[in-house]
Amino acid sequence: MPTIKQLIRNPRQPIRNVTKSPALRGCPQRRGTCTRVYTITPKKPNSALRKVARVRLTSGFEITAYIPGIGHNSQEHSVVLVRGGRVKDLPGVRYHIVRGTLDAVGVKDRQQGRSKYGVKKPK
């Protein structure tokens, strides 16, 4: 327990909270350009080819973002919107690409959970 004199000399430091998505710089989303689109394999109990993209953001960061949904049209030089949100079985992937905005089209033939994949209501 410090004395009053010690606290005057060296005040208590506030606890700084660490963000889980530092590349967004406190914004809800960021725009970026795909520099590479490829697939990676998930961690141990799971097995798949997960679609990811390397994205250079307007904040200057180069990040790896997951492309959700079945099928995509993203390629190099595609302009995409990136949100936070990690993928549990892909180490180092802490961001998601938002489908249905900018160059990333919505998922084709999606009926349920459409808002998460940028799909308009079917007629």
Curated annotation (Swiss-Prot):
Gene3D superfamilies xref list: Nucleic acid-binding proteins
A UniProt-annotated Pfam family: Ribosom_S12_S23
Disulfide-linked positions: none
GO BP of this protein: translation
Alphabetical UniProt keywords: Chloroplast, Plastid, Ribonucleoprotein, Ribosomal protein, RNA-binding, rRNA-binding
GO molecular function ontology, one term from the record: rRNA binding
GO cellular component: chloroplast; small ribosomal subunit
PROSITE patterns named among the record's database cross-references: RIBOSOMAL_S12 (PS00055)
Location(s), subcellular: Plastid, Chloroplast
Entry similarity comment: Belongs to the universal ribosomal protein uS12 family.
Assembly information from the UniProt record: Part of the 30S ribosomal subunit.
Functional description taken from the UniProt entry: With S4 and S5 plays an important role in translational accuracy. Located at the interface of the 30S and 50S subunits.
Name listed for the protein in its UniProt record: Small ribosomal subunit protein uS12cz/uS12cy
Phylogenetic placement of the source organism: Eukaryota, Viridiplantae, Streptophyta, Embryophyta, Tracheophyta
Gene name tied to this protein: rps12-A
